[in-house]
Amino acid sequence: SYGSTPYKKEEARNLFPIFYSIFMKCGDFRRTGSAELDMCYVACGREHGYIERDLKPWDYSAGTVILREAGGVVKNWKGEEPSYLKNEDILACVPQFEENLLKELL
């Protein structure tokens, strides 16, 4: 699933080519509108990955705990640990998708 950063529509020109590239390599995209819900969907196996730019720490902190407890991966788009003190571009996924998704995001 993905988040489209609706508060910064000017970034669509940069984001949509990334979404398109990933979409062409996967079954489908979903958008619930909730970062925490999407991360929980990855944790329970309904989704394999979730990406979104510019999330606030309260948008991804709880989902990070849940997903990691389920064996998932949460990184920023540089492949680093999120700071939890600032907005981050978040990748949340099952471990086997981490490398390929990071290549798309870098």
Model-derived features: positions:
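An extended, acidic
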Residues: S1-L106
